[in-house]
């Protein structure tokens, strides 16, 4: 079986999720004898399977819950799926191919489900889309840290992620109201003395 080694520069230079999905597709190709030209179909297969599996799990996690509790359950389930099925979740997290209706439909079903969960938390439109991007980044970030063991001294990734989700959920009402304030760096007069930057918040 072909072996791949990725350097830190490789990871930082490109999407790690895409690299993982591509690597798995290449392995499938080498085992099945498929030509490189059919790798798109393999990526499509992985993405569809990932979307459908994840959506089924999220529906089960949401059952009997509403609002913040449903959102937290969905977030924890997404993280567990990413840890247990890294290749499928990586394929599912990728943007759907615009020229593949089946792939796009599976993506839109999962996307609509997540927007519906966020709607119960009072978010819609651009606010919901932004919150969803934040949640995806939060989930994937913690998964990557856990897989690579990069959070030194952390006793429990489960507890750390749960606290992060609590903070995320607690901030949703402020985000939904549009009262988000930008933190803009402003050099201080004593920057040369090593005091760094001070920050001021300004309304949008």
What are these regions (language model features)?
Residues 29, 136-140, 144:
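Amphipathic alpha-helical core segments of compact helical bundles
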Residues 15-19, 29-45:
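HTH DNA-binding helix-turn interface
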Residues 45, 49, 59-87, 98-99, ...:
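Hydrophobic alpha-helical connector segments
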Residues 21, 25, 72, 128-136:
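Short, well-structured alpha-helical segments
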Residues 91-99, 149:
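Short linear capping/connector segments at secondary-structure termini
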